[in-house]
Each structure stands twice: as C-alpha cells, then as structure tokens.
C-alpha cells in the first residue's frame, strides 16, 4: 500500500518501486525528479522552500517499512498513481512521436532535395560523359589528322626531292652540253654526287629504252596504217568501178524497159485491131475464129510460169509509164497487094534463153513481107488440122474468091511472158467492115503516175 505522500515535482505518490530522496529542510522528492531538478535549475535550491542545498545535504534514498498484509489490497491512490504514470508516459511517447514525425518529414524533404540533386548530378554526369566521348573522338580525329599531316609532309618532301631530280634529268635531256657540265661541276665530287650521277645515268638509259620502244611501235603503226590505206584505196577503186558498171547496166536496163514498154503497147494495139477484125462474121475468118476459140491450146503455147528476170534484178510491177495513146485512124484502109503466109523459121525463144528478148520480139511481130519460099515448105510446117480448116475448098459460090485470101502462121508474144503461134490474115481489105463504128476513147494517164514514178527509189540512191 503506497504512502500517502507524493512528490511535488512529478505529483506522483511515493511507492516501493521508485527511490525517495530527502533534503536537509525535510522535504522529500523522487530521487530521479530531484536530480533532474538540480540538473535543469540554474541554482541548487529546494523545489518547495527554495533554500540553497548542496549535494552533500541530499539523502539519496529513504527506506520505509511497510507491512505485508497491506500489499494485497489495491486502493484508489495506487491505481490513480499508475494511471497518471501511464498518462505521463503516453504524453512522453506522443511527444517523441511528434518529434520523430517532424524528423521523418524533414528527412523526407531532405531526401526529395537529395533525389533532385542526384538527378541533376546524373544529368550533368551524362552530359559530361557525352562531352568526354566527343572530346575523345575529336582527339582521335586530331591524332589521325596529325598523322595524315605528317605523312603528307613526308610525301611532299619526297615529291619535292623527286621533282628536283626530275628537273635535273630534264636539264640533262634538253639542255646543251655546257649547261650539263656546269650542273655536274656544281654537284661536287662526294658520295652523294656519285649517287646522283648514277641515278641520272639509270634514268637516261630508261628514257632511251622507252623512246626506242615508242619509235618501234610508231613505225609498226605507220606501216599498218599504210597497208590499210592501200587496201582501202583499192577497195574504193573497185567499188567505184562496180558502181560505174551497175549504173551503165541500170541505164541500159531502163532503155530496154522503155523500148519494151513501147513494143508492148504497139503489140496490144495490134492485138486489139486483130480481135476487132476477127469479130466480123465473114466466111474468111470463120475457120480462123473457130480454130482460135475452139482449139484447146495455141500452137507452141507452153504452160505459163514465173521466170527470173534476164538482168538478174527485181522488177517493180507497180511502176507505170506515161505513154501517149495514138488516135484511132478512121480513114479507110488502102488496098494492099496480096501476100501469102510464110512461117517464121526462128527458134522458139524458150530454147535460146541467152538471146535478148527485146530483139526477138522485134523480129517476130513484123507485118511486112510475103511468101517467098515454096508452098511445099508451108505444107511441111502447117499441121494437118490447120490445113483442113484453112486450105480446103468451099463449094459455096460466095466463098470461091476467098481461096486466095489465105493467112500466115506467125510466132509472137502471147502477153503471158512467153511466145506462141497465131494466124495472120494476109489481105486485110477483104475483111468486112463493122456495122457500127466504135469510137475509141482517149486514154490519158493521170499526172499522179509521173509523180509516183518520180518518187520511186532509184538504184543510184542505193549505190551511193
């Protein structure tokens, strides 16, 4: 059971758990409270009566004898004392908590400041590292440039020495004897001069060998070009001769073609005239018309086929020629003397292809000339069916006078590229005139033909 006295410093009751101290003035306090009071107060005085007290005057511990039966009894004062003590400790703890919380807040603020400082320092560190790497690269680049500059200086020095040597060699090659001797005297007579003279000798020897090679190659090239020039001139002369020959052949071919066209036109006119004369229904040409139109094939007519041209060149069949058509003669034909048929003994043109076809066509279609040979030759030449159809006697009285009007078997151009035999009446005056006179239309070539002919490519253009 606690004592009914309490400490005026802490207001707690005295108990056996804590030591009690006393001062000479008689006042009692807890020992801890008194020591704390003396430690915090400016002067050592009694907390209650305020008298001066020294450390020797303090009784540190008082002993109280308490009965044992009273220990088991809990009274309100002890409980209150315990509650007050707990409240005091709680207040102390809360105060410590507040102090610790303030300390934690200050530490957190300091930590935030330190984090910001660390981030800025890290950023500065990164910048410094980047700057260091850049500076290292720049240092490497400068070292490389320095080495290149050093190498360039060495090369420039070597080239300068080489240039001096080349200038000296050029002086040796191009200068006069006196200048060379003066240069050799300036060099002196030491080991370096001997080495320089040896270099000059070797260079001169190499230059001499190079000049010999260049001269040899130039001579070979000149000879080769001379041969090529000779062959080119020979080829040019040969080509010029061939061109002249081809031009002459072309002009001859054009002339022959022009004459052949004229001959074809004249032959066409003669054929038309003969067809008109054969269309009259007279007794004298009935056998001829029957022989021509009913015969399976004319005498000596071969199967038409394509043959190469005689000159060996291609012929443009689309080319036309401007040839004036003669006017039709409306006058009466003059009575011609009686002419007998005579066969042409010339060879067939197909059997002699080497002859000129223009010359053969001129001799085959001649209308003048009568029968000068014997009748036995004609009988041997004419076939039997022509004799039976042309030379038999007619019992009719109107046909008696036609015995003398015999024709001639001729060989001429058939219009298909070959030759054939045909019957030519000898007396054209006995042919009965037509019932109606056919007016011949004038055929005029358009001017576009000449322009198209002029626009055709010529052989001379290809030979240029």
Curated annotation (Swiss-Prot):
Q: Which residues form a coiled coil?
A: 142-186, 236-277
Q: Does the keyword Signal apply?
A: no
GO biological process: one example? DNA repair
Which pathway does it take part in? Answer: Protein modification; protein ubiquitination
Please tell me which stretches of this chain the record labels as motif PIP-box: 456-464
- Fetch the InterPro entries from UniProt: TRAIP_ubiq-protein_ligase (IPR052639), Znf_RING (IPR001841), Znf_RING/FYVE/PHD (IPR013083)
Q: What is its EC number?
A: 2.3.2.27
Q: Which Gene3D superfamilies does the record associate with it?
A: Zinc/RING finger domain, C3HC4 (zinc finger) (3.30.40.10)
Q: What is catalyzed by this enzyme? A: S-ubiquitinyl-[E2 ubiquitin-conjugating enzyme]-L-cysteine + [acceptor protein]-L-lysine = [E2 ubiquitin-conjugating enzyme]-L-cysteine + N(6)-ubiquitinyl-[acceptor protein]-L-lysine
Q: Name one GO molecular function term.
A: ubiquitin protein ligase activity
GO CC, alphabetical? cytoplasm; nucleolus; nucleoplasm; nucleus; site of DNA damage
Family listed: Belongs to the TRAIP family.
Q: What does this protein do?
A: E3 ubiquitin ligase required to protect genome stability in response to replication stress. Acts as a key regulator of interstrand cross-link repair, which takes place when both strands of duplex DNA are covalently tethered together, thereby blocking replication and transcription. Controls the choice between the two pathways of replication-coupled interstrand-cross-link repair by mediating ubiquitination of mcm7 subunit of the CMG helicase complex. Short ubiquitin chains on mcm7 promote recruitment of DNA glycosylase neil3.
Name of the protein in question: E3 ubiquitin-protein ligase TRAIP
Species name: Xenopus laevis (African clawed frog)
Quote the gene name from the UniProt entry: traip
